[in-house]
């Protein structure tokens, strides 16, 4: 049965661009002048340039010793019709050292009408005639998807997954507790969340996933969302060729072997050379390269070394029959001069799409990193490998990479790594790239000596390999500066008009008065937190910086709280660092709650004083106080990293008896002076791995009944509230006009 999607009828307005096609047909009587022709026959080629478009410079191949060349080469430019677009045509002569300009002409694109196609002659030096064929059309099918709705692939997945979950949930809960599951409408949407926290989060999440898999809970989940360290485990799991036929148990054993080695062992000359060759290829193609690329390669070599060519879009096969929960990953877009706690756009990644819900703009995964203009790809690159994205998703660790490898000097001797990470802001890690270079040469160069050019590049590459190797194995500036460490990609929203975009979703009334709640004034971590989250992205910047989402708050709730996903039950696992094992565990959850309220998204009230009343527990349940009023508010089961019952029981209900059994479970997580579970520990001996893995495996299994009870409650709520995507046109208009008014305000 198909359902009406109200978000599909909300128009995310955008301006259409023009596609200007130029076919360089031929030229006759190409000349270098009377004297020049006596010395040499021209080797002509044509260069086309439009300054107002990103992929601005294009050129034909050159012909040796040909005064009547026939090229028949077509080139496309994506143009903003509101700009004064002028085509500059340059006839060039290819030489070994420096190419020579034979003549230049211009053509105003505004003289063309949409739908028109014509041949235009150009005369150079009163003798040479060149014929170009030009056409102009509207780009009616952009490469970005502009919509508030989920993509069709995710909708189809959800429908098929509901069918699977209905049977799985009946099996899990038994006939009595699942008697309310009459149809897929009654199936609650369950999401599993994993926090950041480096390898601690990854190892802990591996134990969680094993428990969820073996207990049948995973078969009842629609989504699994990760941030930073948790995304590394999700990437390892979903990229494994034997998953889901082979469960997490076997895959976790492979993971334990992979993380038992020192990451410095990956920095062999042969591997560094291979890394650098790959980065050189990426850089020479016109894509930005940062330290995050290197970090992603190291993470990839550690965790998925035998599948380094895996891409995000290739993970679609893991959900092709809705056999697994849909994996969702995240990073932040940040601005160079603003703290990420004040401003950050959440970017979501799935095997189907990558995009920002705040602006209603999404793209296929293989287009992320390509060069866009006004929603259309102007230069497509190969899809980034999964390990590059793993580096972006966990890029906080590339910032303090010297601490990760233990090669730092005397800097910050009095601070812990956690304290350093706590103090990092976007201003520390993002270079203000004022030049915003397109990496395109604006000067002609020699083209006949292609062998010489290749030799030059090889020499240059070899020297770069040497420098990079020296930098990687020595205490160099590469390690001692944080600036420029953030991931960088081409801005896929370049040239768009954001004046009519929607900040996140038109779920409820979104007027200025709705922001004056006293509860939003209370700071959780910083007085300025989320102060500028309504600001738009800079659509004039050619590149954007993408960083670890944990730098704003360490739980990926924004992915799951999108009302289009209609999540009923959220099971979150928080592996965030705390000052001690007995410290309150709600900081990240409180930040998520505040973010949700500022975006008018339903979220249960988080009472931090439950810690004072009930003490430290393995998990806490937060429900809407009044479900009839707090419509669409999910239930949250929040697991924290705590060693409580695991000390006494080797499995739920089975006490530890021998001295060895008790000793293996007698450990602290944050109070251990040797810090085996530090956020910056990237080597886990087998015992440390097993302790953390088994702890979270136990904690999850020990609370399976809590999860089942919440599922039963969610089924009943679904039956009483079958529609979870109610949107009125008045709400849509209120949000639109609020955004226009906000964006028109002058900044202080």
Swiss-Prot record:
Activity regulation: the record says:
Activated by cytosolic calcium, which is necessary for binding to membrane lipids. Activated by phosphorylation in response to mitogenic stimuli.
Binding-site list for Ca(2+) 1: 40-41, 43, 65
Disulfide cysteine pairs (residue numbers): none
One GO cellular component term of this record is:
endoplasmic reticulum
Pathway info: Membrane lipid metabolism; glycerophospholipid metabolism; Lipid metabolism; arachidonate metabolism; Lipid metabolism; prostaglandin biosynthesis; Lipid metabolism; leukotriene B4 biosynthesis
> What reactions does this protein catalyze?
a 1,2-diacyl-sn-glycero-3-phosphocholine + H2O = a 1-acyl-sn-glycero-3-phosphocholine + a fatty acid + H(+); a 1-O-alkyl-2-acyl-sn-glycero-3-phosphocholine + H2O = a 1-O-alkyl-sn-glycero-3-phosphocholine + a fatty acid + H(+); a 1-acyl-sn-glycero-3-phosphocholine + H2O = sn-glycerol 3-phosphocholine + a fatty acid + H(+); 1-hexadecanoyl-2-(5Z,8Z,11Z,14Z-eicosatetraenoyl)-sn-glycero-3-phosphocholine + H2O = 1-hexadecanoyl-sn-glycero-3-phosphocholine + (5Z,8Z,11Z,14Z)-eicosatetraenoate + H(+)
Q: What positions are modified (Phosphoserine)?
A: 2, 434-435, 437, 505, 514, 726, 728
**Protein biosynthesis among the record's keywords?**
no
Query: Where on this chain does Ca(2+) 2 bind?
Result: 40, 43, 93-95
What's the protein here called?
Cytosolic phospholipase A2
Q: Give the species.
A: Oryctolagus cuniculus
Name the gene behind this protein: PLA2G4A
